[in-house]
Amino acid sequence: MRKTTALEIADIFSCSLDTAELPISFNVAPTSRVLGIVNSGGGPSVGAFSWGLIPRWAPDTSRAASLINARIETVGEKPSFRDLLAQHRCVLPMDGYFEWNEQLRHDAMKPIKQPYYFSADSQSGYSHRGVLAVAGLWTAWKDPNQPNSPVVHTVVALTTDANDMVSKVHHRMPVLLDPSGVSLWLDQNNVDPLAHIQVVDNEALVVCAVSTKVNNSRNNGSELIEPIMLTQPQPVEELKLF
C-alpha cells in the first residue's frame, strides 16, 4: 500500500527521481506498477517497476503473478533469484502492507479471509518518516518473440520468518531495512548482502484489522486501511501465502 508520492520517496531516501508519478494505491495487486529504489552505479534513484518478477530467461510474462515474493532463506539458491543478488538489489518503499488469516465469526456461515494492515511504528528505527523499506530484487525482461518490444522492469519482495507480533497473523513477513540496512542493501560493493539482514523487533510495526473490502483488488480507497473492530474472531488456519 502506498500513499506517499514518488517525489516524497525520493526526498525521504535521498535519491534521484527516475520516473513519472505513479497513482497512489491503497490496494496493490500482483503485476501492479510500484516504486523501487535501485543503485545502478550513479547513486540511488527511484523508478517504476511491475510487481512480480519475470526472469530474464522467461519466454513470456506468465510467471510474473506467481513471483511476487521470495524467501530470503533460499533466495541465493533459486535460479530465478540467485544471479540477481550481486547487482540487482532494490528497496521497495511502502506505507504498509496487508496480511490475512482465516477466521470463524459468529456473524458468518463459513470461515472468512480476515485482512490485517501492518504499518511502521513512528518511533521505530524501521520507520523512514512513516514509510517502510522492504528488501527486493529487480530485473529487466524483453520479449524474445518481439524484438521491438519495450524492456519490462520487474521486482520481487523478500520475506523472512515473522517475528512474534506478526506471527499472530501470518508466519512470514517482509524483510524490513533500517537506514543503514538500506545503504548496505543498495551498495554494489557489498559482496554478502544477506549477512547484514537483521531480525526485526516486535515494536517495528503496528497492526489493525481492516475491512474485507481489500480482498477485492477492484476496491482502492483510504477506507481500506481504516481500523475495524472484529466480532469475536476465532482463527481457523493460517493461510500459506509465501
Give names to the regions the model predicted:
Residues 1-242:
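Short linear sequence motif anchored by a di-proline
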